[in-house]
Amino acid sequence: MSIVIPLGVDTAETSYLEMAAGSEPESVEASPVVVEKSNSYPHQLYTSSSHHSHSYIGLPYADHNYGARPPPTPPASPPPSVLISKNEVGIFTTPNFDETSSATTISTSEDGSYGTDVTRCICGFTHDDGYMICCDKCSVWQHIDCMGIDRQHIPDTYLCERCQPRNLDKERAVLLQRRKRENMSDGDTSATESGDEVPVELYTAFQHTPTSITLTASRVSKVNDKRRKKSGEKEQHISKCKKAFREGSRKSSRVKGSAPEIDPSSDGSNFGWETKIKAWMDRYEEANNNQYSEGVQREAQRIALRLGNGNDKKEMNKSDLNTNNLLFKPPVESHIQKNKKILKSAKDLPPDALIIEYRGKFMLREQFEANGYFFKRPYPFVLFYSKFHGLEMCVDARTFGNEARFIRRSCTPNAEVRHEIQDGTIHLYIYSIHSIPKGTEITIAFDFDYGNCKYKVDCACLKENPECPVLKRSSESMENINSGYETRRKKGKKDKDISKEKDTQNQNITLDCEGTTNKMKSPETKQRKLSPLRLSVSNNQEPDFIDDIEEKTPISNEVEMESEEQIAERKRKMTREERKMEAILQAFARLEKREKRREQALERISTAKTEVKTECKDTQIVSDAEVIQEQAKEENASKPTPAKVNRTKQRKSFSRSRTHIGQQRRRHRTVSMCSDIQPSSPDIEVTSQQNDIENTVLTIEPETETALAEIITETEVPALNKCPTKYPKTKKHLVNEWLSEKNEKTGKPSDGLSERPLRITTDPEVLATQLNSLPGLTYSPHVYSTPKHYIRFTSPFLSEKRRRKEPTENISGSCKKRWLKQALEEENSAILHRFNSPCQERSRSPAVNGENKSPLLLNDSCSLPDLTTPLKKRRFYQLLDSVYSETSTPTPSPYATPTHTDITPMDPSFATPPRIKSDDETCRNGYKPIYSPVTPVTPGTPGNTMHFENISSPESSPEIKRRTYSQEGYDRSSTMLTLGPFRNSNLTELGLQEIKTIGYTSPRSRTEVNRQCPGEKEPVSDLQLGLDAVEPTALHKTLETPAHDRAEPNSQLDSTHSGRGTMYSSWVKSPDRTGVNFSVNSNLRDLTPSHQLEVGGGFRISESKCLMQDDTRGMFMETTVFCTSEDGLVSGFGRTVNDNLIDGNCTPQNPPQKKKVSLLEYRKRQREARKSGSKTENFPLISVSPHASGSLSNNGDGCASSNDNGEQVDHTASLPLPTPATVYNATSEETSNNCPVKDATASEKNEPEVQWTASTSVEQVRERSYQRALLLSDHRKDKDSGGESPCVSCSPSHVQSSPSSHSNHIPQLQAKGPVPSFSELMEDPDPENPEPTTTNECPSPDTSQNTCKSPPKMSKPGSPGSVIPAQAHGKIFTKPDPQWDSTVSASEAENGVHLKTELQQKQLSNNNQALSKNHPPQTHVRNSSEQLSQKLPSVPTKLHCPPSPHLENPPKSSTPHTPVQHGYLSPKPPSQQLGSPYRPHHSQSPQVGTPQREPQRNFYPAAQNLPANTQQATSGTLFTQTPSGQSSATYSQFNQQSLNSTAPPPPPPPPPSSSYYQNQQPSANFQNYNQLKGSLSQQTVFTSGPNQALPGTTSQQTVPGHHVTPGHFLPSQNPTIHHQTAAAVVPPPPPPPPAPGPHLVQQPNSHQQHSVAHVVGPVHAVTPGSHIHSQTAGHHLPPPPPPPGPAPHHHPPPHPSTGLQGLQAQHQHVVNSAPPPPPPPPPSSVLASGHHTTSAQALHHPPHQGPPLFPSSAHPTVPPYPSQATHHTTLGPGPQHQPSGTGPHCPLPVTGPHLQPQGPNSIPTPTASGFCPHPGSVALPHGVQGPQQASPVPGQIPIHRAQVPPTFQNNYHGSGWH
């Protein structure tokens, strides 16, 4: 019933009434587009997510119960009536669909009998009414209308009334069918026909849009007594004008009706066709009045005004006529002749006698054609008229009209059409030319150029006139059928009619074409016959599937050769399967044709729209080569048509244009995700377009451009033009140059770009999410508000944002390309003339660039393409070679751009370091061109904010993905992953901006920024995190973010909304801003910005924060790559990460690196001094910490960059933990200030971290953003914590990044000096060697030690920390101890915080170790990390309580780990370092500990893992924290190897990798879950995992909750951890947290907060001891008891008993996506943890399989990845990424498979979507996670399972866990 499923999508129309998407009329409008997409290809079913309907997140059709029993369809009948009224009322909107629907119906009807199946219906009739559905059980065919099925909601699985007894309205059915039979025989009534249409619709299911249209139309016809005349026709007409594009979608549905209509025009020789044609002829809504499209009305009014009201002589007549319209009885009667209806005079008519008014839907010809009638199908009932003062209009009477529609064209007409104006509306009347005797057929002259028709034109003279030019030409035309598109354009009115019919009937006609057209093809085919080819083309378009399915005829070409009779027979004989196959084939053909059309349209559009588009196309061609070009053309082709039409077209075109179904699916997914965003689509679209143009996101560009074209045409042409002007210079030129160079230097990247773009563009969701997540995009509410189908186009980097900051417009979307280009230019010449000193190295970080050339690798990854010097390129090449550097070049650009953007907000902070500032000015100038993002940031705060978003967007955005894939699968992965957080960092960016401000005003600003930002950031973060998953939330957040983004600076200024201006100010505040921009960009790209940011500690941190998040996001993407790379090329990958990320950072970061070194001393001292409370210094420290984290990907890079490339890595590896400690310290000490903990950390731990910090500007930014989010959480929940939270946030973000980077770098770092640096930082010299040391945990341990040491140092600042550090050290080894310590520490809140930090740092170290999973020690490290995670959670728990107000809150956020990460930003620093810098920052914010894991995992899976990482990190953290076996859980997550054992046994190193990955995945899942869970209270998170997630998430949320109620959450946190551990099941409580919308907005924080809040009581109930118990015994479900407090959670813990089983079961469930496993949440926790581990492992392994995995990872891991991705996607990708930021989610998508595996995840992406509406998110996550999340735990687990399913499920399940 796949066809039916699409129908279900089609049901979107009905859905329109009944479904979420359907519920919004606009949605319906958009829906057709989406539907169309769906129509495009069967896959759309999944991707389409029917109409950006929010409810069906990942599902193709909102109305479908995928996997569920089809819901009863009785409402179908009533909805039609509703639709009918809607048709009548809003003909424009739904009616179109309805019309199409009815048309489609006929088409289906054409197929009539689907084989020899038995027909049995409650109506008692056995005729095929054209809308029949087959029982999946007994194969009985029934009338859809009789069975009460909503044509728009055709169930996926249908059972007849006997197989599924239910109440049906038999009387209504009988009435309907009787009427239909009459209609079929008389052809007079169409009401039944409409109904019939619906059944046809069923088979038209694939035509998502058509179906929707059909449904609506069907309903109208069905319900309305007007059915006879299908008011739908009129509606269709109007809708055509109003929404030509949509109509295009609908048209396929309509086509069905149209085909029969056409049939009447042409001789349908087939008997079947004859009946159907009769039905078609009769099935139209009688039009008593005309419907006018806005375009026609506007034009007519314009002409009328010009002429004057009475100008038209016929106006009066018209008035008279109109007055008599209803009374006037036309002297004609319709007769059926040769299977077609003709109009004959009922009496002798004198010349110039009014015969009849031609009624229907009036629209402009271009609107009609825009609907997609490219393939010249005859549109028998469309009248073209151009005599009205040259106004080219047409009247579409196919579904809505009167008898005049039957008037045929003839070479010897006896009547003509004349227009009259009445009441200001134009009317067309048929007047006799000469006397017409009674019984003579009324004919009119051809209103179209039949000579250009590619089908056989039917002439009314028929063969009576042997000299008939039409007949002669007609015989030839059959041969030319194939050139449908050209014909469509060339044809005259009729041709247009045909073309229009084609598009509208592209879907409908497709069916019709096969049947009707084919039949019409008989030698006798008349002028209106559709040529088979045309039909085929149409079929290939939307209706293809349906047509094929319905008609099941081979494709039109074949049909062409057969007589209509034969065709009909073949159709009848074809089985449904055959028909389906045919439909699919046709769909493919359609796609190809669509591409062709698109290209043509592109040509038109390029000229019509803006040169920029052409440039864009060129750029695309250059950069993406043919693929992109094709896409661009396709999309552009759509653009030329009216905006509305364009959208549909674009949609269709996009779907079709994507030749690869996978791509299409992605696109659909993206569309679905973005669907919510479409409301403001115009602006966004334009922005998107511009961004695309700039970004050279080839695919995205085309899509965006297409969508934008529409929007631009409508609204944003000016902006577009503006942008284009710049773009041509910067983007086109630079990009072209860059691309060419890139191709030369990195041949792969270019290809990757080409391919990536498709991938990116393909997944509208991804695009939307990415774009939305992107810093630049964050602000754009349009993205969220605009329909998803629009989003797809706008998604890339909403150009609007760019427009807003026009100066920055270039940066955001173009930033990447520009940077890349500039990087190439720099390589060739100096990096942009403007980039004087830094330019050469990496325009991104001016000063840093000059200083750090090593970081070029990172730059390479991120900004290498732009500012990469030859060296960098070389490195990049190496990286590419070793690590799929394909994406490297592209990645750089995206990252760079986002990074810059992020940094821009922090620039002020960074400004502190003169370096950046100096170069900043230069950079700013140079960078401006180099990457718009930098400049845009400067241009205006909004721009900046936008820029941030945009920049972030680029990273996350398809483009970035594209690049990542193309150029640096790994780096990109990291970068992308990092960006994910960065994107998440939209909030982060806000945070960044705040941070920047903070940089200026380190203490207050920081806190405020953190605090303010948290709210904003949280939304942004959430948005970014949940952006993909939860578009709505994302929207809100995005909206919030824009304000917040801008408010960040304001936040600094304490003015949230002023933020924009302020932000801009912040950015612009100091030249640094630009430098920062570069830094940020670098950071985004890699951690370069971090380096630059490093210049100013605060700034750095700020940047770190941003970077952290953005980087996290990007990093996730990149990390996935990294993970893959690391496993295969640990060194290479590490180096890639190191070099690329580091280099990317290094360009900006290297100088900071040097500075870092000196900064190390400097900051060490400062830290010592800061311990007093210098936030700024702390921030840098944090920044360093983040940077270390940033080392991971972007942040990690930043960190690494800061150090040396090698050192960077080391720092990243080593420092990440310290950084967290630092962050934690800042947080801890700075409970209220965010400074103390940081200071403490800074002083001891951050000494090296200071270097780190310097290099971690991005991390800092990220951290800040994170902290801000946390602070927001804190503000919301615990203002006390709020202040610290931001700091922590920053640090954690960085830490997160670091871990990711670390994991990549760790191999190198472990061997490198960074560890020493870390050692310096840390008192322990072991940091580097900690790998062996359990406590230190390998090199990671180095970090761990650093962390520990840092904590001690922190301890120095804060005495408690000292003890805790020791504890942490011990704890690392003894998981229970740490937890117990944590518990013990609980009393010493501050110590706890410090300890937590230490622990987290240790964890980070562990994570880092884990990150260096390649090393057996790393396994140990991982285990250690896990322990750390657990310990950290313990400590965090402890810490949480004490620092409750500020530090605690953040720590709490992270509760065990999550708290550390999230609420525990301070503690999270280690975690962050540990975790994915990206996710942790956002998503993982809550999961500090988890982040470690996540980074580890992320490393390999990078994209997936990163997101997963974060989630998993969180999860891990949660796991660690939550289950007593948390360590195990974490481990599990980390390493199933040491699933249960607390000890960090390094099971098999590979497993660690896998485990790591898995852990990461779980983490990611968890994180996602955490976030989702957080949102959902993480109820769904596996008990263990969920528990963690739940409690953990709860912890995370608790952290937020802590923020809210630090005290509460403190206890809560422990309990939360416990909950996680024991009572992940507490899902119930978690859901309440979702209730907190604001928090939810904060998603990472918010979710945590919610969770925490929810679990607060329970959490409190759970004692640290119990929590510890949970942690300790967490693995064993026994711990559940300990968390009595969190009874809700607690009882899930019992499930934990079920625990492993439950988890496994749950996981399996997850795979099954059954949420039943909720009960086993605790085991889930453990299991989740373990599961995740396994999942991670499974996933991890694929990623591990090779650096290639990232891109490959996405694909190679697709099995695993899908597991993971699925996990992620479901849990991790969607939620996880969503938590981290949809960005990572996007990055996930970047890993095509990843995203794709997310299929379900797509739905989880919906989780992300569901995520967006945090409150709803919880529900949505549930929803998203669907059943999985429905049950808190099951949902989560399901997600995990879903994600893991391929690999994880099996690996994990089979092996991992147990």
UniProtKB/Swiss-Prot annotation:
One of its GO terms (biological process) is regulation of DNA-templated transcription. Residues 505-520, 672-687, 1049-1068, 1186-1206, 1222-1235, 1400-1432, 1506-1542, 1581-1599, 1642-1651, 1698-1711, 1798-1808 have a biased composition (Polar residues). Residues 217-269, 475-530, 630-687, 887-960, 1039-1068, 1164-1561, 1581-1835 are annotated as: Disordered. Residues 330-447 form the SET domain. Zn(2+) 1 binds at C121, C123, H143, C146. Widely expressed in both adult and fetal tissues. Highest levels of expression observed in fetal thymus and kidney and in adult hematopoietic tissues, jejunum and cerebellum. Isoform NKp44L: Not detected on circulating cells from healthy individuals, but is expressed on a large panel of tumor and transformed cells. It comes from the Eukaryota. Glycans are attached at S435, T440. GO terms for cellular component: centrosome; chromatin; cytoplasm; euchromatin; nuclear body; nuclear speck; nucleoplasm; nucleus. Gene3D superfamilies: SET domain (2.170.270.10), Zinc/RING finger domain, C3HC4 (zinc finger) (3.30.40.10). Keywords: Cell cycle, Cell membrane, Chromatin regulator, Chromosome, Coiled coil, Cytoplasm, Cytoskeleton, Disease variant, Glycoprotein, Growth arrest, Intellectual disability, Membrane, Metal-binding, Nucleus, Phosphoprotein, Transcription, Transcription regulation, Ubl conjugation, Zinc, Zinc-finger. Residues 232-250, 494-504, 1039-1048, 1273-1282 have a biased composition (Basic and acidic residues). It is found in: Chromosome; Cytoplasm, Cytoskeleton, Microtubule organizing center, Centrosome; Nucleus speckle. Zn(2+) 2 binds at C135, C138, C160, C163. InterPro entries: KMT2E_SET, SET_dom, SET_dom_sf, Zinc_finger_PHD-type_CS, Znf_FYVE_PHD, Znf_PHD, Znf_PHD-finger, Znf_RING/FYVE/PHD. Ubiquitinated. Deubiquitinated by USP7. O-glycosylated at Ser-435 and Thr-440 in the SET domain by OGT which probably prevents KMT2E proteasomal-mediated degradation. Residues 887-901, 933-957, 1285-1303, 1349-1362 have a biased composition (Low complexity). One of its GO terms (molecular function) is zinc ion binding. A motif (HCFC1-binding motif (HBM)) lies at residues 63-66. Associates with chromatin regions downstream of transcriptional start sites of active genes and thus regulates gene transcription. Chromatin interaction is mediated via the binding to tri-methylated histone H3 at 'Lys-4' (H3K4me3). Key regulator of hematopoiesis involved in terminal myeloid differentiation and in the regulation of hematopoietic stem cell (HSCs) self-renewal by a mechanism that involves DNA methylation. It is linked to O'Donnell-Luria-Rodan syndrome: A neurodevelopmental disorder characterized by global developmental delay, speech delay, intellectual disability and a subtle facial gestalt. Additional common features include autism, seizures, hypotonia and functional gastrointestinal abnormalities. Belongs to the class V-like SAM-binding methyltransferase superfamily. Histone-lysine methyltransferase family. TRX/MLL subfamily. This is Inactive histone-lysine N-methyltransferase 2E. It comes from Homo sapiens. The gene is KMT2E.
